[in-house]
């Protein structure tokens, strides 16, 4: 039964891996023997996270990627397939919030900053759809793969 749910040797692409949630999940995957591709748009956070993850295993690479940029995601997919030959798991974790897109208890819905709301909605919706399209295409060619979408209260 344990082999059925094992991720050992699986190639897992994790968006938002430089953040707390993505980083913690990436750590768990590395500890379970997965090959982890940590993706984040923030270079410093990504570098720090990859260094931390390598304490648990060497099958970790960090790639700068923007979940809202199809060309960036296609490049990541090509790099991953070139290195490990497959993509087994996509974890869509990148997302978040920003000031102005949420309401304080005393604020009204009509007081919300529309431009902030649109940016947050774009990140949290399209930032899940675009990676799913690009990495899902690789998985479809392989005839196997798993896409996991994760969100938080901040999103």
Q: At which residue positions do the language-model features occur?
A:
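Conserved glycine-rich Rossmann-like NAD(P)H-binding loop of the short-chain dehydrogenase/reductase
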Residues: 32-48
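Residue(s) in the substrate-gating loop at a strand-loop-helix junction
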Residues: 152
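A short, exposed helix-loop element centered on a Lys and neighboring polar residues
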Residues: 132-133
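The beta1-alpha1 cofactor-binding region of Rossmann-like NAD(H)/NADP(H)-dependent oxidoreductases
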Residues: 43-44, 64-76, 114
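Active-site Tyr-X3-Lys motif and surrounding loop/helix of classical short-chain dehydrogenase/reductase
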Residues: 75-82, 101-111, 115-122
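Canonical Rossmann dinucleotide-binding motif of NAD(H)/NADP(H)-dependent dehydrogenases/reductases
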Residues: 5-37
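Catalytic Tyr-X3-Lys loop
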Residues: 88, 96, 110-129, 144, ...
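A glycine-rich helix->loop->beta "capping" turn
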Residues: 7, 56-59, 79-92, 98, ...
């Amino acid at each position: 039964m344990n082999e059925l749910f094992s991720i050992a040797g699986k190639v897992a692409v994790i968006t938002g891996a430089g953040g707390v949630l993505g980083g913690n999940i990436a750590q768990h995957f590395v500890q379970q023997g997965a090959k982890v591709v940590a993706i984040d748009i923030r270079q410093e956070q990504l570098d720090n996270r990859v260094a931390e993850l390598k304490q648990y295993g060497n099958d970790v690479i960090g790639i700068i990627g923007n979940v809202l940029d199809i060309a960036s995601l296609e490049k990541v997919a090509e790099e991953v397939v070139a290195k490990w030959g497959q993509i087994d798991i996509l974890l869509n974790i990148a997302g978040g919030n920003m000031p102005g897109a949420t309401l304080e208890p005393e604020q009204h819905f009509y007081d919300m900053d529309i431009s902030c709301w649109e940016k947050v909605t774009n990140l949290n919706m399209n930032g899940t759809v675009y990676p799913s399209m690009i990495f899902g295409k690789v998985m479809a060619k392989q005839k196997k793969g798993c896409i996991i979408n994760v969100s938080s209260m901040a999103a």
